[in-house]
C-alpha cells in the first residue's frame, strides 16, 4: 500500500494544478473523498512509508494525519510562464517564480530562491530526508536535489544524474538564505551536464572545505590541447586560528573519499555557510553579502595542468563580479630561460698587480685570465679607479676586493684631459716578471708588458720590462715617453757597477753629477721642450711637470666627491671644505678662515681702517 501512495504523492508534486497539503480534518467536508478513505485505510494497517522513511523511531502518534484534497491556490502572474511549485515530503509548498530563474550562465545552470529555509535541517530529526523534484524549463530530464542531514558535514554532487546530496552537521542548524541573482535578458535554455560517474565531494567542517574533482569533468572541451591555466584570487581578510585548524583537519578526510582510479585534482576553496557550490563543467559559487542586497553568482572554470599537481583556488568573500567561462582562465606568465654564466678556472694564469695609494698602502690585485671560449659568456665588469685607490683599507677588505677583481677584464684609469685609459688584463704576461714599480698617472702598478690605449683605440703608451728600481712615466706624448725611457735606460747601472737611487733626472742633475763645484747653487730644470723653468726643490719640479701632463694623482676620498688635484696641498685645502676646519684666525677681530690667502686679504682691511 505504500507504493501507490508514494506514486500518487509524486504525481501531485509534479502537477501544478492538483497537489496535496497535510491538514487536520474539518467539519465542512460532509463526504470524504476516495483518496482520503484510502489514506485512512493505510493508516489503520500501518504507518505510511513516507513517514517511516523520514522520522526516526519514536513513540506512536495517537491520531493519524489525513490528506484532504483542496483546490490549488492561485499563483501570482509573472512575466514569463516558467513558474512552478515544489512539494516536499512534509507537505510544505515552495513556489518558484520565473523572475527568480537565471539561465544565462554557461552550462545551463540556474539559481532559484527557497522561501522556506527551515526545511533544511531540524534538530529533532537527524535522519530526515527531503527530496525536491524540479523540472527543467526546456528539456526532457529533471534535476533532483536530495538533502540528507547526518553527523558528517558532506556535500556530494553527482553530475551524471544531476543530483546533489547535502549532509550538513547537526552542530550548526543555521538556515542558508539564497537571494535571487539579478535577472539577465537572455534565452531560457539549459544544457544537460556531462554524463558519467563523475563524483564531486566536499568534506570538512567550519568555513573551509576541500573539493575533490576528477580532471575529466573539469576540462573544457573547447580548450583541449591548450596550455594548463589556473585562476587564483587571494582573500582580503586573513583566516582565523579555528579556520586554519579546520582546514588542516579537512585535507586528510578528503583523500579516502575518491574511489575511482583516475587522475584527481584537489582544490581548496575558502568559503562560508552562505556559499553554495554546484559542480559540472564549471564551478558555481553563490555569495550573499547580506543587508538586503541581491546575491552574486561567481563562476570559476578550473583547467587542470598536464602534470599531477595540487592547485589552489582561493575566492574572496567580498567578490562582487561574475567570472564568465570564456574569461575565467588567465594567461600564464612566460618565464625567461635560465642563463648560465660559467667561469672556467682550469689552468689559471693569474697576474699580480700592485697598486700603491697616495697614503702609502699597497694593494694586491689578482687578475685571472680565462680561455677565449668562455670569454663570450662571461660578463665584463668595469671598475672605477678611485675605488681601487681608496685609502685606509683593512686586511679583510683587501681580500674581498681582490676576490672581486678576479672576474674583471678592463681596469680603466683616469688619464689626463679626462680621457679613459683601458688596462686590458688579457695583455698582461703570466710569467713572473722583475718586481718593478711604475707610476702610471698616479697609480703605481707592477712593471709588466702592457699596452695602454684610449677609448678611441689609439695607442698612447707602451711599457716595457726594465730592471730599474723606480721608473716614473708621466708623459703621454711620444716624444716625452721616448725621452723618459731613454733617461731610465741611461741611468741604469751596468752589471758590474753599484746602483743607487736618483732623486731627480732633470738635465742639470745629470750633468751636475759629473761636475765638482757649486753643488749648492744647482737648480732643477724642466725637461719639457720650450719651457726651461727651474726650481729649487725636486717636489716643485714634479708638481710643475704634472701641469704639462695633466696628471692629478691626489683624489678626494669623501663620498660623492672624487675631485682630483695636482698637488697635495691643494687636496688638503679642499678637504677643509668638507670638514669645515678654519685654522687661520685674525689676531684683531678673531675671525677664522680656511685659507691663508683669505686671512691675508682680510688683514688688509684692518690696515686700511687704521690709515683712515
Curated annotation (Swiss-Prot):
The modification Phosphoserine is found at residue 78. Its main location: nucleus. InterPro entries: Znf_C2H2_sf, Znf_C2H2_type. Coiled coil: none annotated. SMART domains: ZnF_C2H2. A motif (9aaTAD) lies at residues 360-368. A zinc finger (C2H2-type) spans 524-548, 554-578, 584-606. Transmembrane segments: none annotated. GO terms for molecular function: DNA binding; zinc ion binding. It holds the Pfam family zf-C2H2. The keyword Zinc-finger applies. Residues 166-195, 226-250 are annotated as: Disordered. One of its GO terms (cellular component) is nucleus. The keyword Phosphoprotein applies. Residues 184-195 have a biased composition (Polar residues). It is found in: Nucleus. Keywords: Activator, DNA-binding, Metal-binding, Nucleus, Phosphoprotein, Repeat, Transcription, Transcription regulation, Zinc, Zinc-finger. GO terms for biological process: circulatory system development; embryonic organ development; fibroblast proliferation; in utero embryonic development; multicellular organism growth. Binds to GC box promoters elements and selectively activates mRNA synthesis from genes that contain functional recognition sites. Belongs to the Sp1 C2H2-type zinc-finger protein family. The 9aaTAD motif is a transactivation domain present in a large number of yeast and animal transcription factors. In SP2, the motif is inactive. This is Transcription factor Sp2. It comes from Mus musculus (Mouse).
